[in-house]
């Protein structure tokens, strides 16, 4: 009689590989229920669980203690919280120790969950997580099969318009979108500014598609000599806060961009197809002097699929883009180089990679 843990032999690149059938089944089941993890994490964020643990003496609390701090009226709250937190421990989002004769579980933060606690600037990835889990985004997945079979953009098929049109007409979704970008930019830029020194000799910097201006505000704060222009659609910049040294300018990057000796684009090119990217980059080329440069911050997808954490993150983002943008996608180093050359730039320098954002300099 066969074992419940039956194994079979596979070959990978000519080498025998033993794969445990139980492990394969478990992984398939986990994929079938994968939505549970982000939803449980978001629930913990909404309840403020990570902040509560972060503020606790010793940095550890039981589910009962968390429920008390939350002033939960539901008598089953401690049990419900404990079940959610146990799941997060199994994915290393939290860690756990057992205390006392009753074996009470005490939960603490890990290096992952610290990103769901607002930092000194109030930024956390919890606000970023709210975007892909927003009802508007979630509904877009219902349009993927039809888009594959018949064409079109999943988001457009479901909502009847492009995501940026939708955001301009739906203030709630627009707030969620820009809050996500604000928080991601705040967290990423702090670390980028520690490693990337390419702004030191810039005198006039234009952030194309800069949203509410948080990216430029952080750069201008570190480099106050820079004349900073935050450039985005008029309805976007009209809601932007005032920052020292930052001027907000409304316009359309497909028509023209303000002049500067350096132009910055963070998470912009991956929103558009190659033809649209070339239009944007050619406008940037025209707006920079002979010794100018365009600084692109974007994920870079490996030439062949990988299983590293960064490659998984990039692939997740790439497929997310597929649901909302017609030609938007993550690109390889080779594809970015081809875009740079195609727009007239002489070359590209891959300066560094921080927070899975590759900082690329396109030189004239």
Curated annotation (Swiss-Prot):
Q: Which residues bind S-adenosyl-L-methionine?
A: 209, 232, 253, 266
| One GO BP | methylation
Give the first-level EC class, as a single word. Answer: transferase
Q: In which tissues is it expressed?
A: Expressed in leaves, flowers, stems and roots. Detected in the vascular tissues in stems, in the rhizodermis or the endodermis of roots, in the inside of carpels, in the central vascular bundles of the syncarp ovary and in the secretory oil glands located around the outer ovary wall.
Work out whether the entry's keyword set contains S-adenosyl-L-methionine.
yes
Tell me the segments the record calls region Disordered. 1-20
Activity relative to temperature: Optimum temperature is 37 degrees Celsius.
The activity regulation comment is: Inhibited by Ca(2+), Co(2+), Fe(2+), Fe(3+), Cu(2+) or Zn(2+). No effect of Mg(2+).
* Swiss-Prot/TrEMBL induction comment: Up-regulated by yeast elicitor treatment.
Please list the reactions this protein catalyses: anthranilate + S-adenosyl-L-methionine = N-methylanthranilate + S-adenosyl-L-homocysteine + H(+)
SUPFAM superfamilies (alphabetical):
S-adenosyl-L-methionine-dependent methyltransferases (SSF53335), Winged helix' DNA-binding domain (SSF46785)
**pH-activity note:** Optimum pH is 7.5.
> Which key words tag this protein in UniProt?
Methyltransferase, S-adenosyl-L-methionine, Transferase
- The EC number on file is 2.1.1.111
Asked if the Swiss-Prot or TrEMBL record annotates the protein with the keyword Iron, the reply is: no
Q: So where's the catalytic machinery, residue-wise?
A: 270 (proton acceptor)
In alphabetical order, the GO MF annotations are: anthranilate N-methyltransferase activity; O-methyltransferase activity; protein dimerization activity
This protein's assembly is summarised as: Homodimer.
Summarize the protein's role.
Involved in the biosynthesis of acridine alkaloids. N-methyltransferase with a strict substrate specificity for anthranilate. No activity with anthranilic acid methyl ester, anthraniloyl CoA, 3- or 4-amino-benzoic acid, salicylic acid, catechol, eugenol, caffeic acid, quercetin, theobromin, theophyllin, putrescine and nicotinic acid among others.
Family of this protein: Belongs to the class I-like SAM-binding methyltransferase superfamily. Cation-independent O-methyltransferase family. COMT subfamily.
**How is this protein named in the record?**
Anthranilate N-methyltransferase
């Amino acid at each position: 009689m066969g074992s419940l843990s039956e194994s079979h032999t596979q070959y990978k690149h000519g080498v025998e590989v033993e794969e445990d059938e139980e492990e394969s089944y478990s992984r398939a089941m986990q994929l079938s229920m994968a939505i549970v993890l982000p939803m449980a994490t978001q629930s913990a964020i909404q309840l403020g669980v990570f902040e509560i643990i972060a503020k606790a003496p010793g940095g550890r609390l039981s589910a009962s203690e968390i429920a008390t701090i939350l002033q939960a009226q539901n008598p089953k709250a401690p049990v419900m919280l404990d079940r959610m937190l146990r799941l997060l421990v199994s994915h290393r989002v939290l860690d756990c120790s057992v205390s006392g004769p009753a074996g009470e579980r005490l939960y603490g933060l890990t290096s992952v969950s610290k990103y769901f606690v607002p930092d000194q600037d109030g930024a956390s990835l919890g606000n970023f997580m709210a975007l892909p889990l927003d009802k508007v985004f979630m509904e877009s997945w219902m349009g993927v099969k039809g888009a594959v079979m018949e064409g079109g953009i999943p988001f457009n098929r479901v909502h009847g318009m492009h995501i940026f049109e939708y955001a301009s007409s739906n203030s709630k979704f627009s707030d969620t979108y820009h809050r996500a970008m604000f928080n991601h930019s705040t967290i990423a830029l702090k670390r980028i500014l520690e490693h990337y020194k390419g702004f030191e000799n810039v005198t006039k910097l234009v952030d194309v598609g800069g949203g509410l201006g948080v990216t430029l505000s952080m750069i201008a704060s570190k480099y106050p000599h820079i004349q900073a222009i935050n450039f985005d659609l008029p309805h976007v910049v009209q809601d932007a806060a005032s920052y020292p040294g930052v001027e907000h300018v409304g316009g359309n990057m497909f028509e023209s961009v303000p002049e500067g000796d350096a132009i910055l684009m963070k998470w912009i090119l991956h929103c558009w197809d190659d033809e649209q990217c070339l239009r944007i980059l050619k406008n940037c080329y025209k707006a920079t002097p002979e010794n100018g440069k365009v600084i692109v911050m974007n994920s870079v997808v490996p030439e062949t699929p990988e299983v590293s954490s960064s490659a998984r993150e990039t692939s997740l983002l790439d497929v997310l883009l597929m649901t909302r943008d017609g030609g938007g996608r993550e690109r390889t180093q080779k594809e970015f180089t081809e875009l740079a050359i195609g727009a007239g730039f002489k070359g590209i320098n891959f300066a560094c990679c921080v927070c899975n954002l590759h900082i690329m300099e396109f030189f004239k």
